[in-house]
Amino acid sequence: MPASRTNPDRPPEPMNLSGRNLISTLDLSPEEVRGLIDSARALKAGEKEARLAGRVAALVFFNPSVRTRISCESAMARYGGSAIAVQPGKDTWNFECGEGVVMDGNTQEHVRELAPVITRMCHFVGIRKSELITVGSAQGAATGSYDELAKDEFLHRFMEFAEVPVVNLESNRWHPMQSLADSTTIVERLGKPEKKKYVLTWTWHPKSLPVATPHSQLMSAVNLGMDVTVLRPEGYGLEPEVMRLARERVEALGGSLQETDDQEAAYKDADVVCAKAWGSLDYYGRFEQEAIDKAPLRDDWIVDEEKMAKTGDGIFLHCLPVRRNIVVTDGVLDGRHSAVKDEAENRLWTAAAVFDALAPK
């Protein structure tokens, strides 16, 4: 698809988010989201340069990463900056964020020292930390309830003592960089996405996956004022507070938000179908039972050619990595509806746009 912007005659306004943190796209106004999309598209089209020369990003990955790490490092390098990625517990100390903790266990450095020291050596910090990504929800649940993990304590404690902007590279609750990349892809493909139909569909998966990415993919359409449908089986609703915030924002933008388990109605004439598996919050901490109870959903809750045909010319999105013929069939993933490669590439351009906007002016 062409990288040119919707309105190429109007140069993108320079974004200035200097000094701001980015934990979710709710930290941004809808106008700021659109500004970042315009900036990303202008960077992709070669219409502007990110102001990153001499800038340094520290990237702290508690969890594995492919697209996020490469997109952030590439964004910095392409525009004259640099990125330093570290993995706590592997090539750094283990970190502690609790207050008043007697550190006689396996943590060696407290966030009170860590955050100011790191942030005096760089211009922004990106952090990926989720107890639910790597070990899975079952083991993650052993570290606390969903409500406790959704507080993203380490991220917020780091922000408290940081002296430069902090970017969330995925937490237990949010993944804003994925959200911005998805929004950019939607605007590229649809032009004017307002009031167009977006479907976020749950899919079967052998594991109970975290909700951070579907929460943020939901916001990718909400921030564009689309008519949004969350398609999921009974018992697989997203976090109620996230749904409340999403509904409040999308209605203010003239769009709508509904939930349904009616796949026939949801797929019909959809402009965008975004697939993602996630675990049931109703089953949180009871994952073996969830696996048993959701087994009958396996064959029906997959994105296939027949379902995508109901959309007409709808596009298919997935954050990747994806399990072929579990979440989506080969025919869809490799076919005319699929935009997943553009979506993944846009992680680069949105990362560059975010760092450009956050850079000290």
Name the predicted role of every residue range:
Residues 2-74, 89, 174:
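Positively charged, low-complexity intrinsically disordered leader regions
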Residues 51-57, 194-196, 313:
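Phosphate-coordination loops involved in phosphoryl transfer and adenosine-cofactor binding
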Residues 52-59, 66-187:
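Phosphate/diphosphate ligand-binding glycine-rich loop within oxidoreductases
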Residues 62-80, 187-275:
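Glycine-rich phosphate/diphosphate-binding loop of Rossmann-like nucleotide-binding domains
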Residues 135-148, 207-211, 280-300:
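Glycine/threonine-rich flexible loop motifs
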Residues 248-331:
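Rossmann-like adenosine-cofactor binding region
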Residues 313-361:
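Adenosine-phosphate binding glycine-rich loop
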